[in-house]
Amino acid sequence: MPVLRDRIPRRGFFLGLALLAALSGCSSTDTFEQPVPVPEIEASVEFERVWSMSVGDGHDGDFLYLAPLVTGDLIYAASADGELYAVATETGEVAWESEFEDRIFSGLGGDGQNLYLTTENADLVALSREDGSEVWRTSLPTEVLSSPQSNGSLVVAQTTDGKVLGFSATDGEKLWQYDGSVPVLSMRAAAAPLVGGDVVIASFASGKLIALTAASGQPMWQYEVGQPQGRTELERLVDVTGQPLVIETAVMVVGYQGKLALVDIRTGQEIWSRKASSLYSPMIGGGQIYLAAADGEIIALRGSDRREVWTQDRLAWRQLTQPMVYEDYLVVGDFEGYLHALDREDGSLVGQREFDDEGIRVPAQRLANGNLLVFGNSGKMAVFQVKPQD
């Protein structure tokens, strides 16, 4: 979950948690809520570990979001202290490892040729997928915390102060820049942009979703996910920090203290919307929409009419990750490093495992072989199967 921008020392881990909890508890009524304790459950499913490893020092005490990149048979993972790994999805065998000289600030993006990351010194760096060697680097105006995205010819990075920049994937030449507006107070975060062949879609702390031409970065349309309301800057937060979800010719997007909406990707016209508040992208599966609300409730909506099917509140304020659909379950992580499995039919908690005592910020990922990839804040990385207990 993002934190308030420029209000937390990069090494202030415990201060960061306190401010994060305070933010999570702030609403139009300025209510502060403590995270509920880990719920006691009667588990009917288990997280069975297939393999595990350590990726450097993970986030190394910084409030980062170093999501691994999964492509085909390999997982590419990085730590803040510069450890890079390419790992076989099936066995966890290391294909190659590399020590990067700079401190890493973003998760990995990639295309058919390169991997992309950003550094603490605000550089965008391209690395070879074959061995992790540096291909090119270029300077960015300010820090980037979200993974750079590429369509094979264009690499796009979005800074925390609202700039979206396009670069040549071949040599890092800057091709264009779009300057978005940023309110006085915002999350120290930015959603990774969506990069297609002709269009780039980016979301902003101003509560806007904006489509840009991939060729020149010129705006095509914009959609208001949230409109600032209230008297205080906290009340007026409307950040969109989750990457929009593409569904055929539309994108689904959700904002903090805003709404959940489906928008035509060609025109920006709203197809439908409903009130919602979340910091992460929604997930869909089995005709339902799943959302981790800002207050820690997990909500299932019927896709056909967006009516609420169930709500799970036993993980309230536990700073959950984005839910991941896995077979008949939803999987989320939390700030104390627990993994939780929910039954998709009724939202009941059916499985639980303690994974990383430094917490889990990156959502689990479903691998092509059906297993589940989990990355913890300390750098623990593991693959699990979620299955009924014997």
UniProtKB/Swiss-Prot annotation:
Q: Which UniProt keywords apply?
A: Cell outer membrane, Lipoprotein, Membrane, Palmitate, Signal
What the entry lists under Pfam families is as follows: PQQ_2
Annotated S-S bridges: none
Entry's Gene Ontology BP terms: Gram-negative-bacterium-type cell outer membrane assembly; protein insertion into membrane
Q: Where does this polypeptide localize?
A: Cell outer membrane
**GO CC terms on record?**
cell outer membrane
Query: What residues show lipidation of type S-diacylglycerol cysteine?
Result: 26
Query: Which family does this protein fall into?
Result: Belongs to the BamB family.
What function does the entry list? Answer: Part of the outer membrane protein assembly complex, which is involved in assembly and insertion of beta-barrel proteins into the outer membrane.
On subunit structure and binding partners, the annotation says: Part of the Bam complex.
Q: What is this protein called?
A: Outer membrane protein assembly factor BamB
* Natural source organism: Marinobacter adhaerens (strain DSM 23420 / HP15)
